[in-house]
């Protein structure tokens, strides 16, 4: 089954971008008007995140989001066959020299990012760095094994190293032992399970539960930490810029890296709100319900 699915998407990826975007236009009509894919969730998220905006403004953001969402899928499929030359034209790394400077100083780097713009393309930022550097993206495996394998393939097509989130420490330690410099991206805006909630932060007009494990890894490995900001100046073209949070994570107050990341991500989203992934129930767990059901004892979340 996987071979058939891969063959289909690989063949699809061979089409030129202008042709793929025509397919994306049709995909937008399908998911927005016909399937109405998670439109209630998207509308609810936008309304609660931007109470200051009018219904007309929210509707415009919603439509632009679904157009981008269709593009996201097509652009991700394109990674299966895109050449490094074309990718270099479409993905501009603004300040990769900052990362290379850290590498030359003997320090590995960590990039922290959200589900904003086309994060799949970030596995390709190694095109702007020497080939002996390891560049990768930590991901949560998809339950459907066939789809998971397909995404693993597209994330590794241009030299990226996809790593399941539960295995990242093993990879980091191994690369360090081998003297290989690495930059890994951590998508850190997911909603944690109840038992993993140790911090709530204001984010997009919500009291939001956030993961703290990413920060613990960065402290343990003493990585230089950057917020990775993508932008989309026009269709099919992205920029990537690294914003330094700290080169000395162990000296920062607990959770400060996480706090700064969410402030930066929120500002990016406010600049171009249609480029955030609004289809997930990001705020399904509330602080009120958490306080009524759980307490924290010795650093662990336990039922009352």
Language-model-detected regions and their locations in the chain:
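Membrane-anchoring hydrophobic helices of lipid-metabolizing enzymes
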Residues: 1-113, 118, 148-149, 153-154, ...
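Residues that cap or flank secondary-structure elements
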Residues: 34, 90-91, 143, 164, ...
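Catalytic core of membrane glycerolipid acyltransferases/transacylases, capturing the structured
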Residues: 105-166, 193-202
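Short capping/connector residues at structural and topological boundaries
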Residues: 85, 92, 96-98, 121, ...
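Residue-level marker for well-ordered alpha-helical positions
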Residues: 40, 120, 148-149, 170, ...
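Alpha-helical segments flanking ligand/cofactor-binding loops in enzyme cores
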Residues: 100, 124, 215-216
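Non-catalytic C-terminal accessory region of glycerolipid acyltransferases
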Residues: 53, 60-63, 128, 132, ...
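An N-terminal domain-start capping segment
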Residues: 17, 21, 138-144, 189
